[in-house]
Amino acid sequence: MIQRPKGTNDIYGREAKIWKCVEAVIDQVMEKYNYNYIRTPIFESSELFHRGIGETTDIVTKETYDFVDRGDRHLSLRPEGTAGVCRSYIENKMYGDANQPVKVYYNGTMYRYERPGLGRNREFTQFGVECLGSDDEMMDAEVISFSYNILKELGLDVTVKINNLGSVEDRENYKKALVEYLTPHINDLCEDCQNRIKTNPLRILDCKVDDQSEILKNAPSILDYHSKESNDRFNKILTYLDYLDIDYEVDNTLVRGLDYYDYMVYELKLNDSLALGGGGRYNHLVKNLGGPEVPAVGFACGIERIINEMNDESFNNIDVYVMCVNDEEKIKANIITQDLRLNNIICETNVMGKSLKAQFKEADNMNAKNLIILNSEDLSKGLITVKDNVTKEEVKVPEDEIIDYILGVI
């Protein structure tokens, strides 16, 4: 038997229904914030991710799916969405559009060769937004509140963890101090961090190895290396978040795993541990990829992680289950279910030849709110029995009033 590749999933049944509901909420919120949908290729030139994400990042060095096609082109399955959006922005000269900033959102599959686990797959789905062209701190606050409000609307009580990485110059000064501090402790660091001290020292701050937590606790703070301009920018963002009533905490160890961020970075944390998404400002990425100097800010969230944390009890509900046994009842059930569906009522009926007892059980499994119980005796009198499946109360309704009655009780 051929099986799906490790780290991938089939989405069907109840889970597929939840996905559609989550994506509908995302689309509705995107529309309110006036973001336009964008689709970019699933695979791109490998150079795009090497230059965009960073040659020394774990994503590029360990996790990308790279291949050479029949035209001897080096390509990669996209591991994230921002680099592809920026490539499209440059290639299609969106920086010349009349309406600025350019505000776009995406929703699609990404690929990373990681050890599969809860909320972590090799094929996964992200939705995200990118706002290109504005350097205003109000735009940072909008992006943060945007992502925060989407998760709140999905019933997730998240906290924003936010940090100030400072300007490029600030970070370079801090890196030197961090390397100077860590070098005497190099043998006490994990193997990855021993490599990072030469290639990407800021990523050491995000290491999850407990044995070196004491070393990092005494490391220099990035706060001591911020310029006045960097601090002023960051404080403006926090002021906006206060006015917007966003629940946030400043976390000076937060760096994220992508090299293109500068100034503000943030993550959306659930229960102070699980990151459902995050983002930040990247004012130099477009230029690094061959475009003009364009400020930008964005975020991305993993849909699988969101769905894993949602209460999914309400997603398998139907409004009405129409019960029938014999041929006369089946014909009537067919007519009624069609009329209900034309009135946007979610309903189901017996198409498997089940007994009445089995249909009651099936209706309960579907969390049906109401039951329409067809029987020949009622139909001969022009009546239909309707049962409230919560209170268990039954009423007889004239057949020609059944749709109006159901519309009135759901």
Name each region found by the language model.
Residues 1-410:
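TRNA-recognition modules of translation machinery and tRNA-sensing kinases, especially anticodon-binding
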